[in-house]
Design a protein with these regions (language model features):
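Transmembrane alpha-helical segments that form the functional core of multipass membrane systems
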Residues: 39, 258-349
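Extended, hydrophilic extramembrane loops/domains of integral membrane proteins
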Residues: 229-254
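A juxtamembrane structural motif centered on a specific transmembrane helix
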Residues: 340-367
């Protein structure tokens, strides 16, 4: 049908343009965030691209949902402003008739959001947590980036390596170490160094260098030259037996395991999928605009509705996660009311009638 094909083409074009703009904004922020993590020594420099990919996958469901919502608002809002909606309405097509082409265009995106939330979301968080954990368990000198000072985990030592060490070839040149032991501090500089594993401990072995030691109490200063010097660089980490974060748990395991924290995470994952669907109905009703005015207040109300809805999703996750509300009750109340509100607004826009309480009383008194 001409009507369905027209709406679907316009919506697909608007969704694509909106997605590109929002992706550019979000990806730019993610690049800055990821580079900041690497610069602060929170992640390894060689893992920046993979971490950026994981963070992008985590934000993609929200980006798709927001792009779809704005795409509906922009498409129908333009049709209102250019009086195309008046033509469709005069042809006997009501606002509720727009639901079918909007759903027909949007359902692949909603399914993709569901796949991302059910399968990709926990996998990306699991991979991200594993990378962070493995990096934190590495020796302090192994975490040093070339040309950058790296503080140890306890904050008592500072390392500088001109050529960073690696797990395969644990060597470096022009190594600098400052060690603060409270009452004494020392600075060691060597031409080269390497990592040696002794049991669960890692030692940094320095060759051909010198050390300056200073006693803060007595002020005594000592200069020592050495051919070989060994300093503890890190210890083997104990196995992590703690329960995994709910965000890193598979969706099936969330259902089987139960528990408030897992149910809260499940409410969030399912809520994003249901929220993307409900926002389509809200977008149809909030896109109305006056063709005689250049402004589109519906877009402002739509942005406000999106922010409120997603804040309620976070609030619902917290309530369910703390055990205050049952997940079924929370899902029915939040998403059921949002669905009813979307359909109610469509009905109100289509009929364009509001029964004022005073008019209702006057009708009853006249009768």
């Amino acid at each position: 049908m001409l009507f369905d094909s027209t709406i679907r083409k316009e919506l697909a074009r608007s969704f694509g343009a909106t997605l590109m703009v929002i992706l550019t904004i979000f990806m730019t922020n993610l690049v800055i965030r990821t580079l900041g993590l690497a610069a602060n020594g929170a992640v390894a420099a060689q893992d920046v691209v993979f971490i950026f990919t994981l963070l992008a996958l985590q934000t993609l469901p929200t980006i798709l949902s927001l792009s779809l919502f704005i795409g509906v608002i922009l498409t129908l809002g333009r049709m209102y402003r250019e009086s195309e909606m008046a033509i469709w309405f005069s042809s006997g097509i009501g606002l509720a008739r727009f639901i079918r082409p909007v759903i027909a265009t949007s359902w692949p995106i909603v399914v993709l959001i569901g796949i991302l939330m059910v399968f990709v979301w926990p996998w990306s968080y699991s991979q991200y947590n594993d990378l962070r954990q493995r990096f934190e368990q590495r020796a302090d000198v192994l975490r040093a980036s070339p040309g950058q000072f790296q503080a140890s985990g306890d904050g008592h030592r500072v390392f500088f390596v001109e050529k960073a060490a690696s797990a395969a070839n644990a060597g470096g040149r022009n190594v600098f170490i400052m060690n603060d032991l409270g009452t004494r501090e020392s600075v060691a500089v060597s031409q080269s160094g390497k990592i040696e594993n002794v049991g669960n401990d890692r030692f940094l072995v320095l060759d051909s260098g010198h050390m300056e030691q200073n006693d803060k109490v007595s002020g005594e200063h000592t200069h020592v030259e050495f051919k070989n010097y060994r300093v503890l660089a890190g210890t083997g980490a104990a196995p992590n037996n703690s329960a995994p974060s709910p965000r890193a748990v598979d969706t099936v395991d969330l259902v089987l395991t139960g528990g408030p924290a897992y149910m809260g995470e499940l409410a969030w994952r399912l809520g994003l999928v249901l929220g993307a669907t409900n926002l389509l109905f809200m977008g149809i009703s909030l896109s109305a605009a006056n063709p005689r005015r250049a402004s589109n207040w519906g877009l402002l109300f739509a942005a406000l509705a999106f922010v409120i809805y997603y804040n309620l999703l976070n609030l619902t996750q917290a309530w369910v996660g703390n055990g205050h509300v049952n997940i079924v009750v929370a899902m029915v109340v939040l998403h059921g009311l949002a669905f009813a509100l979307g359909l109610g607004l469509i009905w109100w826009r289509e009929h364009a009638t509001v029964i004022h309480p005073m008019k209702l009383l006057l009708r009853r008194s006249a009768a």
